C-alpha cells in the first residue's frame, strides 16, 4: 500500500492533529517526519482533549503504531514527560518507535536559542526558545548528537565533550552566560537513555517492510508550508522542511512510496510570531476570529494573529507540495459573519499579482485584493454531510476549491473527532 502525506498549507496551526486522528482509523502507522517540540497539535475525543508536541497523533488510536522519524529533533525530557502524561490518562505508549537517526536537543541548544533571540532584540525571529534551530544547525554542521548515541555511553561522552568545548566558549565569552557542565548533562541523558532504549529502532526499515506488506503509512508534518526553511517567509520560518518534499527523507522511505498529499487548511488564516501576513486583521473582526476559534498556541500559549482566507498562499501550497486534496478545518468559526472575504490576489505598487511574490520584500508590501462572499448564521457544528450545509457555506467551500486549485475532500465543523464531513475518501 502507498504512503500518504499530511501537511499544513498555511503558517501552521491548521488542525493537523484532528486530521491525523481522523485518518488514523484507516492507517497502520503515523510518522512524524520533521520539527520538534516547537509545535503542538490538539486532538479532542469526546470530553477529553490531548495536546501533543512530539508524539504523533496516531498514539491515540490503539491499533496504530506511532513513529518519530529521523527528521525530527527530540528533547528527551519533553518526550518522556509527554509519554508520562499520556500513560497517566490510560494511553499505552509502549507502541511508540523512535528513529535511531533522529537528533537530540541538548541543554546548550536551548541556552543558545534563548540568548541569541534576546541578543537580536527587535530583529528577533520569534523562536520558541526550545533549541530547535541550533539543533538543526549542528545537524548540518555534522556536530550533532543522535538518538543512537544514547545507546553507547562512551560515544555519547566523547561527542558531548568535544561539542561543549566550542559551545561553552560561545556562551561564556560571546554572550556572558554560564557554561554547561559536562558531567551533569551526561548523568541526565544516561537516565533518559534507560527509559527510551526500548523505543529506539531502525524505523526506516520497519516502515519499508510495512509498506511492502500492504500496510498504510501516514506521514505527518508539523508547522506549515509558509514556515518551511526553503519555501516559507524566510527568515520568519522554522529550521526544517515541513513541505511534502521532505516527508520521505524525514521518515526514511523512498519518495515513490507516496501516492497522496493532503493539505490541511483553515477556513481563515492565522500566524504566530513575526513575519509578513497580508490578510491580517488588526481590528474587532480579528479579535472575534481569535476568540471564537480559540486561537492561542498549543506550545507557547501565544495569541495567534488572525486574518481572512488567503487563496494566494493556498495556491502556493498546492504548487510546492503537489497537493492532491485539501482538508478544510474550522469552517464553523465563520458562522455568524455577514460577509466572508477571500483574498484572491495582491496589489503590489498598483499592479495585481495572483501568485506568491518572488521576493520577501515584495511579499512584505503585498496588499490583499478581496472578493466578498455572503456569510451564514446557522450553527453547523452538528452537520455531518456536505448536502446539509447552508448554501452560503457550500458556496464558500466551492470558491476555496476554485481559487486554491485543489479539491476539498473533508471539512471540519468543530474540534471533536466526529465533527467532520467527508466529501471524498482520503484513504
UniProtKB/Swiss-Prot annotation:
Q: What protein am I looking at?
A: Adenylosuccinate synthetase
Where is substrate bound in this sequence? 298-304
Please give the biological process terms from Gene Ontology that the record holds: 'de novo' AMP biosynthetic process; IMP metabolic process
From the UniProt record, report the name of the gene that encodes this protein: purA
Q: Spell out the PANTHER family in the cross-references.
A: ADENYLOSUCCINATE SYNTHETASE (PTHR11846:SF0)
Q: Name the domain of life this protein comes from.
A: Bacteria
Q: Which UniProt keywords apply?
A: Cytoplasm, GTP-binding, Ligase, Magnesium, Metal-binding, Nucleotide-binding, Purine biosynthesis
The active site annotation covers 13, 41
